[in-house]
Amino acid sequence: MTPKPAGPPDGGWGWVVAAAAFAVNGLSYGLLRSLGLALPDLAEHFERSAQDTAWVSALALAVQQAASPVGSALSTRWGARPVVMVGGVLTSLGLVFSAFARSLLHLYLGLGLLAGSGWALVFAPALGTLSRYFSRRRVLAVGLALTGNGASSLLLAPALQFLLDTFGWRGALLLLGAVTLHLTPCGALLRPLALSGDPLAPPRTPLAALGLGLFKRRAFSVFALGTALIGGGYFVPYVHLGPHALDQGMGGYGAALVVAVAAVGDACARLASGWLADQGWVPLPRLLVVFGSLTGLGVLAMGLVPTVGTEEGWGAPLLAAAGAYGLSAGSYAPLVFGVLPGLVGIGGVVQATGLVMMLMSLGGLLGPPLSGFLRDKTGDFSASFLVCSSFILSGSFIYMGLPRALPSCRPASPPATPPPERGELLPVPQVSLLSAGGTGSIRDTTC
């Protein structure tokens, strides 16, 4: 029998996995972010309110995240490769089914349930597999993969507006169904990797496969609570930034430009944040607090911008606020997944990723419909963005208790080498980076 490697290769095929995760993220969250541009067309076609149509994107987000632990459990049992490939097929079928919808219920089932279930099977296994391939450059690799969100939004926002103008919402969804089928070959690139911290046998029970025992660890529980609160406002701009720009007096392509500006800032910030986190200059929990708070302030700023005088106006204040939001939200995203190996160990990172996505789904299910409800009551999205920013700022405040919850931040040091397959805190080298020269002392990035 071939012995297991001592640790992640920190490169090699890992960069191919990073490229696959990049595409998976772009075809999931990038597409979900751009779908908000189609909501006004759906509301007009079906003669329904903004709150009713917001449930289309909200259900897709909620199902994708709520079912992420199922994707993680299936990946733990059968491997990430087949799970992601099946998820790509389900996502494509959901979009194609939605193109022939005769009512909002059909869209709820097609985009919300079927496509959302497919997205649930692709994201957590892909990102969890990527985390297993890297150690010293883990957050940078995760940040690189998560730039797929911004890069995809940059391309899909104007492309989707063009498709809506040219083919209508039915033709646009049909073509997007063909595009998302590319998730299947991306899954084929996720080569399995055996590590020394892996359990000798797959979990025997469904509860063990879901990794619910991780909530017994105080650090993970604090992190999960803060992340769930942030999810209540984090995804509202994904769904309603485009419609908010339209309400502010900008035309269709002006609204697409606002989404694209946020996407560019998001993509650039994810790489920069990943590089910064891997340097070890600032502990990861403190970075979470800083960039989480800035994200909340960015959403607040978008809710306070004045309206544009004419439809031809470009809305410089909203563009600036969207850029600031994109930079802060993009900086926050890789830290959420980069900190997980330090909280639960490399053996539990796939399960923890799924659980975090499930918790964020609680906010993802609440935020967009609440935003649509407030828009129907007030006439615009200003109040919606103000309320959702309070969720993000509250979650960032919860993160401030994270260092105290980590065993390595208490006066008594933890054991030097706890078994990672039991979901315990990894030794410091697993969550830190060597000095800039590649050698020398290792800096603790946890506290």
Swiss-Prot record:
Record-linked Pfam families: MFS_1
Q: Where do transmembrane segments lie in this chain? A: 12-32, 54-74, 80-100, 107-127, 139-159, 162-182, 219-239, 249-269, 288-308, 330-350, 354-374, 383-403
GO terms (molecular function) for this protein are: pyruvate transmembrane transporter activity; symporter activity
Entry GO CC: endoplasmic reticulum membrane; plasma membrane
Q: What is catalyzed by this enzyme?
A: pyruvate(out) + H(+)(out) = pyruvate(in) + H(+)(in)
Record membrane topology: Multi-pass membrane protein
List all topological domains (Cytoplasmic): 1-11, 404-447
Where this protein primarily resides, as one coarse class? endoplasmic reticulum
Keywords from the UniProt entry: Cell membrane, Endoplasmic reticulum, Lipid metabolism, Membrane, Symport, Transmembrane, Transmembrane helix, Transport
> What highest taxon heads this organism's lineage?
Eukaryota
Q: Name one GO biological process term.
A: lipid metabolic process
Q: Which Cys-Cys disulfides exist here? A: none
Q: Where in the cell is it found?
A: Endoplasmic reticulum membrane; Cell membrane
Q: Which protein family is it in? A: Belongs to the major facilitator superfamily. Monocarboxylate porter (TC 2.A.1.13) family.
- What is its quaternary makeup? Interacts with isoform 2 of BSG.
Protein name (database record): Monocarboxylate transporter 11
